[in-house]
Amino acid sequence: MANSKSAKKRALQSEKRRQHNASRRSMLRTYVKKVIAAIKAGDHKTAAEAFAVAQPIVDRMATKGLIHKNKAARQKARLNAKIKAIAA
């Protein structure tokens, strides 16, 4: 347990950030899951619409440091490739 005043403050800040990041990470996963569900259903239009909504959120989370920028790029590329495969 934190002994000094500054250590207590850091512990409180850390917990606050952890909860905030967990909420954001959950939101990100939800949007990505919507795209994946539409892809599995084989619905190109719905998948494309869900991807259009999820894409800026993935980018924003990478900018904020919640996920790595390479992970964001990889996630978007893979989802987009799967959506294009449905159309073909």
Swiss-Prot record:
One GO MF term attached to the UniProt entry: small ribosomal subunit rRNA binding
Extract the ranges annotated as region (Disordered). Answer: 1-27
* Disulphide bonds in the chain: none
Which controlled-vocabulary keywords does the entry list?
Ribonucleoprotein, Ribosomal protein, RNA-binding, rRNA-binding
Supply one GO CC term from the record. small ribosomal subunit
Q: Which superkingdom?
A: Bacteria
Tell me the SUPFAM superfamilies matching this sequence.
Ribosomal protein S20
Q: Which InterPro entries does the entry mention?
A: Ribosomal_bS20, Ribosomal_bS20_sf
BP GO annotations: translation
| Pfam families assigned | Ribosomal_S20p
Annotated family = Belongs to the bacterial ribosomal protein bS20 family.
Alphabetical list of PANTHER family matching this protein: 30S RIBOSOMAL PROTEIN S20, SMALL RIBOSOMAL SUBUNIT PROTEIN BS20C
Explain the purpose of this protein.
Binds directly to 16S ribosomal RNA.
Matches recorded under HAMAP family: Ribosomal_bS20
Name of protein: Small ribosomal subunit protein bS20
Q: Which organism is it from?
A: Shewanella baltica (strain OS155 / ATCC BAA-1091)
> What is the primary gene name for this protein?
rpsT
